[in-house]
Regions:
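N-terminal metal-binding scaffold of metallo-dependent hydrolase/deaminase domains
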Residues: 1-53, 64-66
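Alpha-helical scaffold segments that flank or form the walls of functional sites
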Residues: 33, 83-153, 176-190
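Metal-coordinating catalytic core of metallo-dependent amide/deamination hydrolases
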Residues: 139-256
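Short coil/turn connectors at secondary-structure junctions
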Residues: 2-3, 54-56, 62, 125-128, ...
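N-terminal-biased segments
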Residues: 66-108, 228-243, 253-255
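Divalent metal-coordination and catalytic microenvironments
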Residues: 32, 37, 63, 74, ...
């Protein structure tokens, strides 16, 4: 958005009182005033008209309720086409649905189109901020950042890191993984409203070498985010126990 925009609607939002506690604000008739795409003021209709000259135009959305955008703190870009894919266990579901969907992102044009569609789907549902798993492909994560940047969306994302227990075309050795990740961090982390998250998928698909790589990258870039999965079902937990017999529990796999 460019220029100045005033929106009239019923408003609901969270704010902080003088003690710093969150309080719920509600205006039966209120205004949100934006300049150059940023909210600069939220106020009642009475206060708005008291300070604005007569005849100033605004967009009237009454009787609709205007609320802050939603935040999705865990979502996978390539799973937009496999929603509700059924399976009895997580590992079987990955083999049947998730991995085949992710293999398609090897195609650069496909990844670019799907990244743009994914961002549009989030925004159309009122989700204005998300933490996203991309795929193992560096160009797919790049396309995601490009699409989010074009819409000035707040996004935390990272390329998925896997080096075992997945289709061979979704595996990446440590050197290539480091190069792709460092390039994405340098280009996108802290750019606009974008941030990078180190993204080892989960312990089943990462060797100790790859997890050590994540630790090293985090030491080099301590302001990065980290996202993964843990303890989603019993079969997965048993598999992790077999792969990492020296660790006392699932969480210690990531901590050590």
């Amino acid at each position: 958005l460019s220029g100045r925009l005033s929106i009239r609607a019923r408003l609901l939002s969270l704010d902080k009182d003088l003690q710093g506690e969150l309080v719920l604000d509600y205006y039966e008739d209120g205004f949100v005033v934006c300049e150059e795409g940023l909210i600069v003021e939220v106020l009642s209709a009475d206060d708005y008209f008291a300070k604005m000259p007569s005849g100033v135009s605004y967009e009237d959305l009454r009787p609709y309720l205007l609320v802050p955008g939603f935040i999705d703190n865990h979502v996978h870009m390539p799973q937009q086409d496999i929603i509700a894919g059924r399976s009895s266990e997580l590992l079987d579901w990955l083999d049947r649905h998730a991995f085949p969907a992710e293999l398609r992102y090897a195609d650069h044009d496909f990844a670019r189109i799907k990244a743009a569609t994914f961002v549009d789907q989030l925004l159309s549902a009122g989700t204005t901020c998300a933490q996203v798993f991309s795929t193992v492909h560096g160009h797919a994560c790049e396309s995601l950042f490009v699409a989010a940047s074009a819409k000035k969306m707040c996004l935390v994302a990272g390329k998925v890191m896997m080096d075992r227990n997945a289709p061979v075309d979704l595996l990446q050795n440590a050197a290539d993984c480091r190069d792709d990740t460092e390039r994405l961090i340098a280009k996108w982390h802290g750019r606009g409203r974008l941030s990078y998250a180190l993204t080892p998928r989960f312990a089943v698909t990462s060797t100790e070498e790859q997890l050590s790589l994540c630790s090293d990258l985090l030491r080099r870039h301590p302001d990065l985010y980290v996202q993964t999965h843990i303890s989603e079902n019993l079969q997965e937990i048993d598999t992790v126990r077999a792969l990492f017999p020296r660790q006392r529990d699932y969480l210690e796999v990531y901590e050590h």
